[in-house]
Regions:
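The feature captures the beta-strand-to-loop junction immediately N-terminal to the Walker
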Residues: 31-33
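Helix-to-loop junction immediately C-terminal to a conserved catalytic motif
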Residues: 46
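Conserved ABC transporter NBD signature motif
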Residues: 54-66
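Conserved signature/switch motifs of ABC ATPase nucleotide-binding domains
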Residues: 122-125, 143
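Hydrophobic anchor residue at the start of the ABC signature
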Residues: 137
Length: 243
């Protein structure tokens, strides 16, 4: 992003002159208090909104609109109830063309990777909330996007399922080399997932914190001192700009 500004009519800028670069293959988390502009920034990164000034670039090209190089996952899985799991995963392909054998193979590989191979012919109503979120993740990755955008995707899940989904997301994106932008209110989630954490306040990115924890990440590290020092650092950054 280069000097990106976005304003809703009659309001101060929601995104106010942001310069931000994400390295390919990294996991970037975006945190900040409610109303600071996180979701608007995500929509700009997705091409769902166009900035009034500045540019959003993806792989060196100015982003004009959403395309197959982008994957999306939001808080509600929004699966099609009348379609089987495999067809829900293939939906981004079906919107562009008739799925071929390679598309189906890729979809089945994602379901297998996420522990859902035996559910390919089931309907969403037959799945738990966590399983539905895994289907939504597979759907977001089926076109092998360069950038995956997620807005509070696990917020409605219980703590155990949420932790499992965090591990699934990390493992799957690492294996595929996918660049991720993940919006969350949860500092501990951001520290667990992120290579970098951007702190947003009043439409600006006010801090960009590099997280250097040993990998692969496991849930037990949440109880260790280095993890909690990073959590305290992010919290201090958020508290400092809000004071």
């Amino acid at each position: 992003m280069e000097q990106v500004v976005f304003t809703y009519p009659g309001r101060p800028p929601v995104v106010d002159g942001i310069d931000w670069r994400m390295q390919a293959g990294e996991f970037h988390c975006l945190v900040g208090r409610s109303g600071c502009g996180k979701t608007t920034l995500l929509q700009l990164a997705a091409g769902l909104l166009r900035p009034q000034s500045g540019r959003v670039l993806l792989q060196g090209q100015e982003l004009q609109a959403p395309g197959p190089q982008l994957g999306f996952m939001f808080q509600a899985p929004t699966l099609l109830d009348w379609q089987r799991v495999i067809d829900n995963v293939l939906l981004p392909v079906s919107l562009q063309r008739r799925p071929g054998a390679g598309d189906v193979e890729r979809a089945r590989a994602l379901l297998d990777q996420l522990g859902l191979a035996s559910h390919a012919q089931h309907y969403p109503r037959q799945l738990s909330g966590g399983q539905q979120s895994r289907v939504a993740l597979a759907r977001a990755l089926v076109l092998e996007p360069a950038l995956l955008l997620l807005d509070e995707p696990f917020a409605a899940l219980d703590a155990i399922t949420r932790a499992e989904l965090q591990d699934d997301l990390l493992r799957t994106c690492r294996q595929r080399g996918t660049t991720v932008l993940f919006v969350t209110h949860d500092i501990r989630e951001a520290v667990y997932l992120g290579d970098r954490i951007a702190v947003m306040h009043a439409g600006r990115i006010v801090d960009d914190i590099r997280i250097d924890l040993p990998g692969p990440h496991v849930q037990a590290m949440r109880d260790e001192a280095p993890f909690n020092r990073y959590c305290a650092q992010v919290r201090k950054s958020m508290d400092g700009v809000a004071a």
